[in-house]
Regions:
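Active-site beta-loop-alpha junctions enriched in small/polar residues
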Residues: 35-37, 69-71, 97-102, 134-136, ...
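Active-site mouth loops of central-metabolism enzymes
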Residues: 36-50, 101-110, 142-149, 257
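Active-site acidic/histidine proton-transfer and metal-coordination neighborhood
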Residues: 7-9, 20-21, 87, 106-199, ...
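Acidic (Asp/Glu)-rich catalytic clusters
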Residues: 21-27, 55-60, 74-94, 112-126, ...
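Acidic/histidine-rich catalytic cores of soluble enzymes
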Residues: 32, 65-66, 154-262, 315-318
Length: 320
């Protein structure tokens, strides 16, 4: 039996993966995110698809692994989580973890949350702990951080790094709309005052005013994980201006299948590969199902399939 690829964490052996067309240098490195199927914990987000259908569609597309997704979508205990994923031939990468680290009074609580999640990820074979720096756990509108705030955050991130290392994980910082690392100014402060690895999210960087291609070229050495997300900039601008909430923007189609938005996905991947990046690329097109569940074999699976087709036809031919 082939051994899992060390550069991707817990990839499945290649001969166990369904082949749906070559991805060249990206074979075995493209993974799924439940949000691409509309799975989100935000009240009023939309219809939630059953986990068995989502996992089955991931497997049908030949995706070898997934992030955890919203609370309640997958079991949050072992061995239940690994057993469920195993039925669909999927490995666990890790997942998205909101933490409050700018307030020293909440540090102990944040570290306790981080430890609990790290234990779950480790037990399930995960390798990536994706930190989002929220204002609070209700996702209140963030207060733009100062340099002093970010120095405090940096101290907290180092403590989370230690927790992750003790559980065989790599922490990556996720710039994200609605967090304290949202805008180009926030990203610059975080780069200057923290030494954490990064999750390069092409969509959220673009929305925040950061060119993801330039980020990949300049900071590729700090990238430990990647979310591939395309964006309709016109809709994103309405979110940034406050005309639309993030949820309204998603429901209006702000995030698009790869190759149908305004992000230079191919240039970003090429820059990352040239920087030496060897990790996962997670397909993450946030959607909201607002008109009920789609018929079997239709709906989100079509968009994810289109993302894979984009990688095969547009990105892979540009890679060595």
């Amino acid at each position: 039996m082939a051994t899992p690829r060390a550069d991707c964490g817990s990839c499945l052996p290649e001969e166990e993966l369904p082949m749906s067309g070559t991805l060249g240098a990206l074979d075995g490195r493209i993974a799924a995110a439940p949000i691409s199927w509309g799975i989100c914990e935000v009240p009023g987000w939309g219809e939630m698809m059953p986990s068995e259908r989502v996992l089955g569609e991931m497997r049908e597309l030949g995706l070898p692994a997934t992030e955890l997704g919203a609370p309640g979508f997958l079991p949050e205990a072992e061995p239940e989580l690994s057993e469920l994923l195993g039925r669909y031939g999927l490995a666990m990468i890790g997942g998205f973890v909101p933490l409050v680290l700018h307030d020293p009074a909440q540090r102990a609580d944040a570290l306790a949350r981080a430890t609990a999640v790290a234990k779950l990820f480790q037990a399930a074979g995960g390798t990536r702990f994706v930190t989002a720096l929220v204002q609070d756990y209700d996702w209140s509108t963030p207060v733009p951080p100062t340099a002093d705030d970010m120095k405090i955050v940096g101290e907290g991130l180092r403590e989370v790094d230690a927790i992750c290392a003790a559980h065989g994980l790599v922490q990556v910082l996720h710039p994200h709309v609605g967090t304290i690392v949202e805008t180009a100014a926030d990203v610059a402060l975080a780069l200057e005052h923290t030494d954490v690895a990064w999750c390069l999210d092409t969509g959220h960087l673009q929305i925040g005013g950061v060119d993801p291609v330039a980020f990949a070229k300049e900071y590729g050495h700090r990238v430990g994980h990647v979310h591939l997300k395309d964006v309709d900039v016109a809709t994103a601008d309405r979110v940034v201006s406050g005309e639309l909430t993030l949820l309204q923007g998603v429901q209006a189609g702000m995030f698009r299948a790869l190759g149908t938005g305004d992000v230079a996905i191919d240039d970003a991947v090429v820059a990352l590969e040239e920087s030496g990046y060897q990790g996962w690329y997670v397909l993450e097109q946030d959607i909201a199902l607002t008109t009920g569940l789609p018929a079997e074999g239709t709906g989100p699976i079509d968009d994810v399939r289109a993302c894979l087709d984009c990688l095969r036809t547009t990105v892979v031919p540009r890679l060595p």
